[in-house]
């Protein structure tokens, strides 16, 4: 079953049990349940989702449909703000950023996204180097927070907020290869540690173990972007 958010992007529905009733289970089932609880990761029916988005031109078609909206945008000082939740693998967002650059090549961009899937975050980061070459004055933010928390970049869970992982990546160099190497290094060193998922004990839905925010921008643009770079709260 496919559902659509306000931008029309397809999302595979995430099915998970909310409650396991007390009953006799085979030893094999008990082992499986214990393994799932200990080694839970967010896949969101990932095989079907990836098969769909990689074998169709859906995201390109949606980006084309959004062009009239982009052309009507009027940014307000100090930047054009773009919010994408959830980001997915970033394919659609990158197309939108290209369109915005064509219309506003000299306006600073503050792009804020949320994505709970570590795999999608990795794929999204891999697409970023070219964006920082074409549009230098960009601040890109990724969080694993809930939808209602993602604009404030702050967890509503007081206990979890104390464990906030706030990572700032200042890209150095002047080529997409330089930026790509730095982001790949960040992926290897930090991403798997700070993007862990668990089940919400009340709803059974996937949620973050620890709130995490990644802020990315070019080091040589820090002075001009100072007013729009988010600060840890």
Where are these regions (language model features)?
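Acidic/glycine-enriched edge-of-secondary-structure segments
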Residues: 50-56, 86, 207-215
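Conserved class I S-adenosyl-L-methionine
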Residues: 77-88
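Local beta-strand N-terminus motif with an aromatic residue
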Residues: 78-79, 231-233
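Glycine-rich SAM-binding Motif I of class I
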Residues: 89-94
